[in-house]
Amino acid sequence: MSYGLGTENQNLPGFVVLQAGGARVPHGGVGLFSNGYLPAENQGSIIVGDKQPAVLNIQPRETDAAQRSRLEFVKGLDTDFVKSIGGNNDVEAAVRNYETAYRMQSAVPKLCDLSGETEATKKMYGMDSPNGVTAAYGHQALLARRLVESGVRFVELSCLPEKMGGGQAPNPWDQHGNLKGGHENMARQVDQPIGGLLKDLKGRGLLKDTLGIWAGEFGR
């Protein structure tokens, strides 16, 4: 999608994978949201919305001027290298990723700052739930709405592991025992946040331009 349509926000990746509350990358690793055969800027970028920093190494370690100078130096080296070999999509994509990462330093903290959201909105997403995993998934869902508002093309939410019979922590829906209890726990985790997200998107006029997909790899 990001490859075909591009991004509407130059300060954020076109594909974001959200985590919160201890959600993990599923079995299969980051290859599950890789760019495949597309340029590198089309791979998913993980944002952990309830931690600081939300993206590893996102906080600048030097002044903006020094960082800009360093970035231009590296870009110059990479550009000269690409010219010397007659073009290389991977290197060109890396140069574009440098620029995106530079701009994300200011964009990501603003994205993750929920102080401007009303308590009613947070409650709608279940962020006040006594069930911690519901609250954490609701945190992701609220960030998903903010990303959609910001023009990010593709947003993926991550389910949280729960204690249940037969389920493996990184793949909490992949259960092999106590299915009724385990699936009830998982449904309780995601039901209110997903409902809140759809209601919020509709109320803001965003749902008409947004496709929501809730899916797993099988229906055990």
Q: Which residues does each predicted region cover?
A:
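Ligand-binding pockets and gating/stacking loops
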Residues: 1-220
